[in-house]
């Protein structure tokens, strides 16, 4: 019921936006104050919508493949000998020129560090890269976190702090990067990582995608920096599984699209 209710809220919000967008202009003199009031009402409505989406998003757990997130992936000593070659190299921070890009790579590196831990790989370079990116970004919102490594969790606590500091768009950019990175990793060793999922976890991914796309779509209308993110996550719409079997099949079908989305977000 909870999931249906948020979908209903999203649909109602779309209807409201459509009505306000098509509303005839008032032809009376001195209507600037009226328009200003209407604009304030629209902006407040958008804020309420975004806050609602973030609250729901913050309740969702990370995909069950991450070591420090009570992940269910169990690797044998033999499996740990074959180190993953698909993780983002910590040196990628040198290619992060824009502020949005730095947020996205920070989120992805934090995810990859978790996978490196699972494979008993050294994480010194990840720690150094994450620390450097955090310093470059210099976001006071991160003070609410126990450590910057957990920024990818995109919690409600972090959202509130980033909202206060006027950085909501970066919150959703990190959320998009984190989700794409986790999906990408899952596609690189599907048989192993999919074993960590149950039907609830698979359905949770679908719900996460719906919330993320809704938020990004709304933001892209006001922030041109978010538009590329909207394009990057477009392929995720095909992921609507409610069972593990469906999730595995859909991941296999859109493996290349997920890799392409990752490339867009991390370049």
Roles of regions detected by a PLM:
Residues 94, 98-101, 105, 114, ...:
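Non-transmembrane, amphipathic alpha-helical segments
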């Amino acid at each position: 019921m909870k999931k249906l209710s948020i979908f209903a809220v999203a649909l109602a919000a779309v209807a409201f936006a459509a009505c306000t967008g098509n509303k005839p202009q008032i032809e009376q003199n001195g209507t600037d104050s009226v328009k200003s009031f209407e604009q304030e009402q629209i902006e407040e409505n958008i804020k309420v919508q975004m806050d609602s989406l973030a609250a729901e998003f913050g309740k969702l757990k990370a995909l069950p493949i991450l070591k420090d997130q009570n992940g269910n992936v169990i690797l044998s000593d033999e499996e740990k000998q074959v180190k993953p070659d698909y993780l983002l190299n910590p040196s990628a921070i040198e290619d992060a020129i824009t502020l949005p890009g730095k947020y996205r790579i920070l989120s992805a590196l934090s995810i990859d560090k978790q996978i490196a831990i699972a494979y008993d790989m050294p994480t010194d370079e990840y720690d150094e890269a994450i620390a450097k990116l955090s310093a470059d970004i210099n976001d006071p919102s991160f003070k609410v976190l126990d450590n910057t490594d957990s920024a990818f969790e995109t919690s409600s606590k972090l959202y509130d702090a980033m909202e206060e500091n006027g950085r909501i768009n970066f919150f959703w950019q990190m959320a998009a990067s984190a989700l794409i990175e986790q999906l990408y990793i899952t596609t690189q060793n599907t048989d192993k990582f999919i074993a960590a999922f149950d039907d609830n976890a698979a359905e949770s991914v679908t719900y996460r995608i719906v919330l993320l796309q809704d938020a990004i779509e709304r933001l892209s209308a006001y922030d041109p920096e978010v538009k590329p993110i909207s394009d990057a996550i477009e392929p995720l719409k095909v992921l609507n599984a409610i069972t593990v079997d469906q999730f595995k099949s859909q991941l296999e079908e859109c493996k290349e699209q997920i890799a392409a989305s990752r490339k867009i977000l991390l370049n």
